[in-house]
Regions:
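Gly/Ser-rich catalytic/binding loops embedded in alpha/beta enzyme cores
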Residues: 1-138
């Protein structure tokens, strides 16, 4: 959905800290992404996949994001999702949002990964990212 425009600067800072002997925690320098309905206070929007929330900048990190950053993890970006985390209707394709389009499997572009956290799952499943956060609304965690 979107990449953190500051990710390279953040990673360079963490690399310098490690070289100086400082390690923030067990996830120091490990990249992760979050589903685009999870708040992160940086230069990315939190839109839940909807054009209606374009420009939405939240005032603070979600608690889980703050904890991961404190442990040294690097927020690489936001993953696509089913618009509004699947809370619109049951009559549309899972993994689709107006803003991000249809999420596809990295191994078979004709396959819908399913669930509202499809972008997070597809990214981890394709080994594009070490780990990702999703949310359970209507089948994502199954």
């Amino acid at each position: 959905m979107q990449l953190n425009p500051d990710v390279m600067d953040i990673a360079a800072c963490l690399d310098a800290e490690r070289e100086a002997g400082k390690v923030r925690g067990p996830l120091h320098g490990i990249p992760f992404i979050v589903k685009d309905n999870i708040a992160s206070k940086d230069n990315m929007e939190t839109t839940a996949g909807s054009w209606a929330l374009l420009g939405s900048i939240v005032p603070r990190d979600a608690h889980v994001v703050a904890q991961l950053r404190q442990a040294g993890a690097v927020l690489f970006g936001k993953a696509t999702l089913s618009e509004w985390a699947d809370m619109r209707s049951s009559n549309y394709s899972e993994g689709y949002s107006g803003r991000g389009g249809q999420c596809r499997s990295a191994y078979n572009l004709t396959v819908n990964p399913g669930g509202s956290s499809s972008g997070s799952g597809a990214a981890v499943g394709s080994n594009a990212i070490a780990f990702a956060l999703g949310t359970e609304t209507d089948g994502s965690g199954e």
